[in-house]
Amino acid sequence: MPKSSPLRLGVNIDHIATVRNARGGRHPDPVRAALTAIEAGADGITAHLREDRRHIRDNDMERLKAEISKPLNFEMAATPDMVRIALGVKPHAVCLVPERREELTTEGGLDVVGQRDSLAPSIARFNDAGIRVSLFIAADPAQIEMAAKLKAPAIELHTGAWCDAITDDEPAKVAEEWRRIVAGAALAQSAGLEVHAGHGLDYATAETIAALPQIVELNIGFYMIGEALFVGLGETVKAMRSAMDRGRARVIAA
């Protein structure tokens, strides 16, 4: 059994900004949400500055970096403009993701194999700047191995297909996707990569995946913002932290 590391919770506050932007103005404030999440136990804050600025804005990233006490994870497409902005903000970490304007949310993992020549310079620039790079990828061996070759310190495994299969009550696909995640986490750790996971996670799936000892960080947003409408963001963060701790305890007890 691989030794377990502490499991961090990164709270994605994008959809606080989605609500704000529905009417314009400054409320609800994503930075206030980030501070609330941290007070409730979040280990870091994730925000995605999309090229179309549909939720998070440039000023949000600058304020988050200046005002929060925990690490900022800057999600972004690996475009020259976004690389320039991120280097200016100097977050603790960046997560490179695929991005299409017509999508409602990030729909798949980054094609590191196909885009290795364009990704390599960006990864190198962030490494040189002391900004931790993670690549948001499917649990595919070729993608994981290429991430290691490009000297990305970390990957974030895309858990969306697994979570969708659970929602759609497709047990065979659930089992298949879970096997891919388990194998991918083990391969990534053996390749020297720090392993994160995210997309579509809720209390139950976060508790399940927390039992994988290789995974050291979960980034969760949409579900938590939805739950916060009913019980408040602070209570939602505490409940998610508890779910993760229950899952992690199964590793410790094993």
From Swiss-Prot:
Q: Which GO terms describe its cellular component?
A: cytosol
Would you kindly state one Gene Ontology biological process term found in this protein's UniProt entry? pyridoxine biosynthetic process
Key words of the record = Cytoplasm, Pyridoxine biosynthesis, Transferase
SUPFAM superfamilies given for it? Answer: Pyridoxine 5'-phosphate synthase
Q: Which residues bind 3-amino-2-oxopropyl phosphate?
A: N12, R23, G200, G221, F222
- Kindly indicate whether the keyword Cell inner membrane belongs to this entry: no
Instruction: Tell me which residues this entry annotates as catalytic.
Output: H48 (proton acceptor), E75 (proton acceptor), H199 (proton donor)
Q: What is its EC number?
A: 2.6.99.2
The UniProt catalytic activity note for this protein reads: 3-amino-2-oxopropyl phosphate + 1-deoxy-D-xylulose 5-phosphate = pyridoxine 5'-phosphate + phosphate + 2 H2O + H(+)
Under the heading Pfam families, the entry gives: PdxJ (PF03740)
Q: Where is this site: Transition state stabilizer?
A: E156
Binding locations of 1-deoxy-D-xylulose 5-phosphate: D14, H15, R50, H55, T105
GO MF, one annotated term:
pyridoxine 5'-phosphate synthase activity
| Primary localization class, coarse | cytoplasm
User: In which pathway does this enzyme or protein participate?
Assistant: Cofactor biosynthesis; pyridoxine 5'-phosphate biosynthesis; pyridoxine 5'-phosphate from D-erythrose 4-phosphate: step 5/5
Localisation: Cytoplasm
Q: What class of enzyme is it?
A: transferase
What is said about its interaction partners and assembly? Homooctamer; tetramer of dimers.
Protein family membership: Belongs to the PNP synthase family.
The cross-references to PANTHER family, in alphabetical order and at most eight, read: PYRIDOXINE 5'-PHOSPHATE SYNTHASE
Q: What does this protein do?
A: Catalyzes the complicated ring closure reaction between the two acyclic compounds 1-deoxy-D-xylulose-5-phosphate (DXP) and 3-amino-2-oxopropyl phosphate (1-amino-acetone-3-phosphate or AAP) to form pyridoxine 5'-phosphate (PNP) and inorganic phosphate.
Name of the protein in its database record: Pyridoxine 5'-phosphate synthase
**UniProt organism field:** Rhodopseudomonas palustris (strain HaA2)
Taxonomy-wise, where does this protein's organism fall, top ranks first?
Bacteria, Pseudomonadati, Pseudomonadota, Alphaproteobacteria, Hyphomicrobiales
| Chain's gene name | pdxJ
